[in-house]
Regions:
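A generic transmembrane alpha-helix motif of multi-pass inner-membrane proteins
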Residues: 1-16, 196-240, 244, 249-250, ...
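Transmembrane helix-loop junctions in multi-pass membrane proteins
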Residues: 2, 22, 72, 85, ...
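Extracellular loop-to-transmembrane helix junctions
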Residues: 2-19, 78-110, 119, 164-174, ...
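Membrane-interface "cap" regions at the ends of multi-pass membrane proteins
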Residues: 13-72, 251, 288-289, 293
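Flexible loop linkers connecting adjacent transmembrane helices
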Residues: 23-51, 77, 88, 92, ...
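Membrane-interface helix-loop-helix modules in multi-pass membrane proteins
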Residues: 50-113, 124-128, 145-159, 324-354, ...
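Loop-to-transmembrane helix boundary motifs in multi-pass membrane proteins
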Residues: 128-143, 331-338, 389-392, 400, ...
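Extracellular/periplasmic helix-exit of transmembrane alpha-helices
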Residues: 265-281, 334-376
């Protein structure tokens, strides 16, 4: 099959889904937004966390934060393990009916509860115990994300020293954009063009003056430490001066990159040469059996629990009007779905399937894994513009820009979660954003600087999808309490819980029997227990509501 057909169908699919399922079904039947309702960004405006943003700027922040490397890595891994057919189908179906619903509803529930996180709302709609369990679990997950993305960013600056200048010089550029935008010294579109031009110049400057420091170990320690310092700054400074503008500017990098990929697909129009389904690995692969691990491997682009924490963390506090949430939340997720489809095409068509040198499996194993596949495939699609080598570098640079946007947002999210989890239990002198950030940064720093994060990372995919499943429990309980139809969230709750628990049980078998690793096996058991406890709490709430 020619890749153009897949891309065109996917684009039509998400456009129809946005206007039909998003606007006509989910928005009208479950939320019914009213612009006259003051959003937290206005009602609780403090100039630091709560501050209204233009919808396009907020879309850029939200989209950059949820994207990261996820919609690139997951689909490419899935193509190599399961085939391009299952990967594309899961992206298109889940992206619309699970992921976009999950993100939009998480955003709106937070907006209607003073901008608190989804785990915090669990106390009201499920139970106090559910809130505590969920907050602790999500906090630990976010700390792990900070460590891992800090590691990825630091490592990328060692392997690609050309990235050092654009990574750090974007900070003052973003701050300048933020000040100009806040004071309205220039129209937004003019400010945007200047900022994008500035970023392109910084990327060019980075390639002219790559920066290296001492040994690999020394460089890693320095870059990782500086990234944690930056994360601290992005967490405590007003959102409009650094976090929001940096993410917004970065979003244009990915949009321009994906646009180039579109052009490449339409001009080169390669045929899909990877298998539609890899039948011989249907029962067992390095990633686990197709069912349920397809639904774990591809998270971003389909459904990701991490998105709900961003939507109810930073995004809900910046939403200007309730009606903007559809564009930001639902639309942002569908944009990620399109990126996932492009990556399926890159892996399944732009690169020849096979184990020979420079073929897909060889590149995946010997040249940077999924990110190496993306860079090489992007280079081949855009070789008629830049040449293959320059195209590869541009592709990898795009990915690295987005690693930073997930890192800085995660630190701020960890601060919010720390406040919600223990803020009211601390002495008054410690109830401040600086202390909350330190509480989150220190364990993340220790995990990253010692590489200890690697010991638990194999379980992150399942843990992330468990977050999504638990969020759907809360959403279902919320709509049940409001006498709204629960069919749009209940089926997703059951599906995500089933697939996630199935995956965790397989991991328990693997780490206790097939390939013993008792630490990982024990963590998997804890996650299953957490899921069961949340199910029990949710059922109790619905049962008590029926009796009442």
């Amino acid at each position: 099959m020619n890749s153009i057909y897949i891309l065109v169908f996917s684009l039509l699919w998400v456009v129809v889904a946005y206007f039909w399922y998003g606007k006509r079904v989910i928005k009208r039947k479950l939320i019914d937004p009213v612009d006259e309702n003051p959003t937290p960004s206005h009602a609780m405006q403090d100039g630091v966390d709560f501050y209204p943003a233009p919808s396009i700027v907020l879309f850029g922040h939200h989209f950059s934060s949820i994207a990261g490397a996820g919609p690139i890595v997951g689909p490419i891994v899935a193509v190599t393990c399961f085939g391009w057919g299952p990967a594309a189908i899961w992206l298109l179906v889940a992206g619309v009916f699970i992921g976009a619903v999950h993100d939009y509803l998480s955003l709106m529930i937070s907006v209607r509860h003073q901008g608190v996180s989804i785990p915090d709302t669990a106390e009201k709609y499920v139970s106090k115990k559910a809130k505590f369990l969920f907050l602790v679990f999500v906090w630990l997950t976010i700390v792990l994300v900070i460590a891992v993305f800090g590691n990825l960013a630091a490592t990328s600056m060692i392997t690609k020293p050309e990235l050092v200048i654009p990574t750090f010089a974007l900070i003052p550029l973003a701050m300048l954009f933020g000040v100009i935008n806040k004071n309205r010294w220039l129209p937004l579109w003019v400010n945007t063009i200047i900022a994008i031009a500035g970023l392109i110049f910084l990327i060019w400057l980075g390639f002219q003056f790559p920066i290296t420091i001492g040994t690999k170990e020394t460089a890693y320690s320095i870059w990782f430490t500086l990234l944690m310092v930056y994360g601290f700054a992005a967490s405590v400074t007003p959102v409009w001066i650094l976090l929001q503008p940096r993410d917004y500017i970065s979003s244009w990098v990915l949009i321009l990159g994906i646009s180039l990929a579109f052009i490449g697909i339409f001009i080169v129009h390669p045929d899909m040469n990877a298998p539609f389904v890899i039948a011989e690995t249907f029962k067992d692969t390095s990633q686990g059996p197709h069912v349920p691990f397809l639904f774990i491997v591809i998270a971003c682009g389909a459904v990701s629990g991490f998105h709900s924490i961003i939507a109810s963390g930073t995004t809900s506090k910046q939403l200007d009007r309730e009606k903007d949430a559809m564009f930001v939340g639902f639309g942002g997720m569908l944009m990620e779905t399109v990126i996932g489809i492009v990556c399926v095409i890159i892996a399944g068509a732009a690169i020849t399937w096979g184990t020979g040198e420079n073929e897909l499996q060889w590149i995946f194993k010997n040249s940077g894994g999924a990110l190496g596949v993306y860079g090489n495939g992007f280079g081949r699609l855009t070789s008629f513009i830049f040449g293959n080598e320059v195209g590869v570098v541009i592709g990898i640079t795009i990915v690295n820009v987005f690693i930073m946007t997930t890192l800085d947002t995660s630190v701020r999210l960890a601060r919010f979660l720390t406040n919600e989890m223990i803020g009211d239990k601390l002495p008054a002198k410690l109830q401040n954003k600086f202390f909350y950030t330190v509480v989150a940064i220190i364990p993340a720093f220790l995990l990253g600087i010692t590489d200890s994060w690697a010991s638990v990372w194999p379980l992150f995919g399942a843990a992330n999808q468990l977050v999504a499943a638990l969020v759907f429990i809360i959403l279902t309980a919320y709509f049940y309490s409001k006498n709204k139809p629960i069919r749009y969230t209940l089926w997703a709750t059951v599906f995500m819980l089933t697939m996630t628990i199935f995956a965790l049980c397989w991991m328990i078998w693997k780490y206790f029997v097939a390939a013993p690793n008792y630490f990982l096996g024990s963590v998997a058991v804890i996650l299953v227990v957490l899921a069961v406890l949340m199910i029990i709490e949710g059922c109790k709430k619905i049962g008590s509501a029926k009796k009442a």
